[in-house]
Amino acid sequence: MLSLLLACTSDPEPTPAAGSPLGIPLVHDGVLYAGAAAIDVTPEIRETFTDLDGDSTWDGDEPYVDADGSGTFDPVWIAGYGPLRPANGVHDPVWARAVVVAIDGEYVALVGLDLVGLGHPRIWQARDALVADGFAPERLIVSSTHDHQGPDTMGLWGNPIGGIPGFDPAYQDRIAQAIEQAVRDAAAAMVPVDLTVGRVAMRDRGPWMNGPRFGGKNPDERFHGMIHDGRDPVVVSDQLLVLQGVGDAGTVFTLTNWSGHPEVRSESNNDLSSDWVGVTRAVLEAEYGGIAVHLPESLGGMQSALNGQLPLVLDDGTHVLATCDAAAVADPADADCFGQPEGADRIDADGDHVPVWAEQDSWAFVTSHGWAIAEAAIDALAAGAPVTGPLRVDREPFVLPISNEAYNVLGPIGLFDIGLDQAITDSAACPEVSDDVLGCFEAHVFRLELGPVGFLSVPGELLPELAWGLPTDDPRWVTEAADPAARGADATYFWQHDPDCTATVPDYEACRDTLAIGDCDCLTLHAWPYRLSDQPGRAPLLDHLDTEYRAMIGMADSYFSYVIPEPDFNRAVSLFTDDGDHYEDTVSAASVFADRVLDAHQRLADRWAR
C-alpha cells in the first residue's frame, strides 16, 4: 500500500535501459570486480571577508571582497556549527568518491561525499541520469561524511534570519554531476579483485582511547572508544569496519566506516577541509595506493572526539610522547619520572608511555584523529578475512512528516535545497499534513549484503543505540536506565540529569512537551526506563543482519538530521528555544523519525525472509 501511495505522490523513477549498465561486468564467473574514482568538488572561493573580532563569523558590517560587484557578500558558506561562517581559503580539498562492486550479475555503487549532508533531490538527479543508462535505482547508495568544514549544501548555514540560504544552486548541480561521473568513472575502472574485510573496536586501541569511567586513562572521564559522547546516555558506536579491494595491479580501493563526526577542527575555522576524514584517506592511500573512501556509521547523539582528548600524532605519523624534565626526575612524588634520566619517556606504573595531548580546535587535533583511524584500519586489514559473494542489495521507501517547527517556518521562504514544492501534501500519503506540518517527504532505507558483510542505511544521523542496542551487560547501565535517582553528576551514562527533577517529576512523559517544571530543567532529562521505541518487539536495527560483519551507513540517500528514539524525544525544543541536552531534537525532522526507520527496515527484513 505504501508503494502505491508513493507512486501517486512522488515523481516516478525512470525505467533502466536493458543490457549491462555503464559497462559493469555482469558475468556469472564467481569473480569479484571493483572500481573506484575520486572527483575534487572543492568550490571556488571568490569573495572573502576580514574577521575583525576573530569569531570566524561574518557580522554584517565586517569588510569583504565584492568580486562580482553585486553589492552583496556572496561567499562559500561553511556548513556545521552556527550560520554565517564564510570560507576564506582551502586547507585541503573536498571530494566525491565512489566504489562500484559486482559479482555474478549483481552490483552496487557506494558514494561518499565530503559534505554536511545532501538532500535527495540532488542524489536522485544523479540516480536518474544513471538509470537512463541502465543502472538500477536501488543499487546506488550515496552518503555524506557529515563534514563540518565543507560547503553548505542544505541551506541552513547562510543567513537564516535574513532568509538567505547558504547553498549555491550551481554548486548543487555540480555535486549531482560529480556523483554521476564518479560512478561512471568507477564502473569504467572495474577489474577483478580480492576483497578483504577487517574490523576493530576503538575502545580496544589502548588505554588512552577510554576515560576512567570505561576502564582507561584518558583525561576525559567519559571518553569511550575515541568518542566524547555529548548527549546522555553515553552510548557509543566505536566499531571501525574496513573493506579493501586489491587487483593484479595493486589496491583499487580502501573503504572505512566509522561513527565519529568530521567536526574536530571546530567552529573557529574559515578554511574548507574534509576534516579528519581527509587525513585518514591520505594515510591509507600512501600506505596502499588506490582510492580511499569513507562512509559514516551511526553519527548521532553525539558521536565525536570533539571536546575530548587525543594523543598527539604529527603529520608524518610520529606519536609524540611526554618526557621527564629536570623537575620531574628530581620529584619523589612523580612516580613516572623520579630517578629517570632527564628527557626519558614518561612511563606510568603500568608500563604505558604517556602521550602528549593534541591541542583542541587545531589542525594538529584533526591530524591526530585521522592518523588514529588510519592506523586502526591498517591493523584491522592485517588481521582481516577474505570476502566473496553473494551480493544482494535492496531498498524500502517510507514517508517522513516534517514536524520540526523551524523547518516549517524557514522552509516556505526558500531557505533549504529540499524545497516544500517537492513535499508530499496529499493527506492519504501524508496524514500528518496540517498548519504545523506542511508536508512529508519520501525517503529510503537500504540493505546491502556482500558475503559475510552486511550494511543497513538511514537517511540521517542515527543514535547508536538504535543500531547496536543498549549496554545491558553493564550493571551501571541497568540501574541508571531504570531509576532516575541513580542519575546525575556521579553517574556513568546519565551524568547531566538535574537532581532537582528526581523528586518533582513523576515520569519523563511529564517533561516531553515542556522545557521546565518548576525548578526542574527538563532539558537535562532522558526517558526512564530508557528504551528504543514504545512499539512492542522493536529490536536494534542491526539485529536484522545475521552476517558476521555488520554496520550502518548513515546519511544515505538524503539528510533529515538526527534519528532519535521516539520515547526520548523532547517535543518542546526547537531552534528558537534553549535545547540543553536535547540539541539533536531541535534539528531532527520529526519525533517519529526513528519509528519510521524501524518500520521500514522491518518491512525490508520481512521481504528478505520470504
Describe each PLM feature range.
Residues 14-143, 150-375, 381-610:
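Conserved beta-alpha junction segments in alpha/beta enzyme cores
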